[in-house]
Design a protein with these regions (language model features):
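Bacterial N-terminal signal peptides that target proteins for export
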Residues: 1-12, 21
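Terminal connector regions
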Residues: 115-166, 246-275
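Short acidic, flexible loop segments centered on an aromatic residue
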Residues: 56-57, 61-87, 132, 197, ...
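Intrinsically disordered, low-complexity segments enriched in serine, threonine, and glycine
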Residues: 184-275
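Short, solvent-exposed loop/turn segments enriched in Ser/Thr/Gly
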Residues: 42-48, 108-109, 121-128, 188-192
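Beta-sheet-dominated interaction scaffolds and their linkers
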Residues: 27-57, 99, 175-189, 197
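C-terminal segment of classical bacterial N-terminal signal peptides
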Residues: 16-25
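Intrinsically disordered, low-complexity Pro/Gly/Ser/Thr-rich segments with frequent PxxP/GP/PP motifs
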Residues: 81-118, 218-245
C-alpha cells in the first residue's frame, strides 16, 4: 500500500504561479504592480523599479534573481544547467532591498545596477527578477487541530511576477525578419501567424502591427514581443481585432516595430496576402 507523505503536499503549497501582464508599462500579480516590466542596463549606470501595493492589506515580497530561457513558442523555462554567460549575468546584478513590506497604496523603489567584471566579453547578458509574495502565517484554530480522520491540508498558492533585466556591453546590433505569414483560426477566430527571425548580438523587443490598406488602425497588434539571444526564430500568432475581422483577407503589411530613444524603428516589414 502506498504510504501517505504530507511533505509532498507541503512542497506543492510552495509552488510559484508566475504571471505577466501584456501591457508593457506595468506588470501585476495579485495586488502588486511593477513598473517598468523590462530593464535594459547599458554600462554601469543603474536604474530604479517602482513597486506598488494596490490591495487593502499590508503585503510582503521577497525579491530574487532567476535564470530563464525562451522557447520557440515564447515561453520562459527554468535553466537546470547555467552556461558561463548566464552565471556571469547572475553574478553582476546588484539590487536592494531584497525583501519589502508594502502598506496599501504605498509605492517603493528597488535600486538595481550591473557591475561587469574586468575582461568580460562584450555581449548581452540577462537575468529575471522575481517578486514573490510571502504569506503571513495563519493562526492554528481548534478546528484545524481536531480532524476526525486522517490529516487535511489547505494549499495556499504563492504568487510572483518576473521581469527581465538585460545588460548590454559593447556596440551590439540585431536584425529581424518576418516570414511565412498566413491566416489561422484560434478559438474560432481569425489570427495572423508568421515566423519572426532574429540575428546579431542582442535581443529584440517591440510590437507587431498587421496593417491593411484603407484602414487606419492595425487589424491585429501585439505589444511586448521579444526574441532573446538564445533564439533565432519564434512562431507567433496574433488575434485579429474583432471589429476588423472582415478585413482579415487579401494584401496586408506586417511590421515589427521597436521603441528606441530616437523613437519607433521598424526592425522588419513584409507584404503578404491572407487567404
Amino acid at each position: 500500500m502506498t504510504s501517505f507523505d504530507p511533505a509532498r503536499l507541503l512542497i506543492a503549497a510552495a509552488c510559484i504561479a508566475v504571471m505577466a501582464s501584456p501591457t508593457p508599462a506595468q506588470a501585476g500579480v495579485g495586488d502588486l504592480l511593477v513598473a517598468p516590466t523590462r530593464i535594459v542596463l547599458n554600462g554601469s549606470r543603474g536604474t530604479q523599479i517602482i513597486l506598488n501595493n494596490i490591495g487593502d492589506d499590508v503585503a510582503t515580497y521577497r525579491i530574487s534573481l532567476e535564470l530563464r530561457r525562451m522557447t520557440p513558442d515564447g515561453s520562459l523555462v527554468d535553466v537546470p544547467a547555467p552556461s558561463e554567460a548566464e552565471k556571469a549575468a547572475e553574478a553582476m546584478i546588484l539590487y536592494a532591498p531584497r525583501k519589502i513590506t508594502l502598506p496599501p497604496n504605498q509605492p517603493q523603489t528597488i535600486n538595481i545596477a550591473a557591475r561587469a567584471p574586468a575582461g568580460l566579453a562584450d555581449g548581452e547578458y540577462r537575468v529575471h527578477l522575481l517578486f514573490r509574495a510571502i504569506h503571513a502565517p495563519r493562526p492554528v484554530t481548534a478546528a484545524a487541530t481536531t480532524a476526525a480522520k486522517g490529516i487535511s491540508f489547505a494549499l495556499t498558492p504563492v504568487y510572483g511576477v518576473t521581469i527581465p533585466v538585460i545588460v548590454r556591453l559593447g556596440n551590439l546590433q540585431a536584425k529581424a525578419g518576418i516570414a511565412n505569414v498566413h491566416l489561422v483560426r484560434e478559438g474560432g477566430k481569425p489570427a495572423v501567424a508568421f515566423d519572426l527571425t532574429r540575428s546579431g548580438s542582442r535581443s529584440t523587443f517591440g510590437e507587431i502591427r498587421v496593417m491593411k490598406a484603407g484602414i487606419k488602425d492595425p487589424i491585429a497588434i501585439q505589444r511586448g514581443i521579444a526574441i532573446y539571444t538564445e533564439l533565432t526564430q519564434r512562431s507567433i500568432a496574433i488575434p485579429v481585432d474583432d471589429k476588423l475581422a472582415a478585413a482579415a483577407t487579401g494584401p496586408v503589411t506586417v511590421q515589427y516595430v521597436e521603441t528606441t530613444e530616437m523613437g519607433p524603428e521598424v526592425l522588419a516589414e513584409t507584404a503578404a496576402v491572407l487567404r
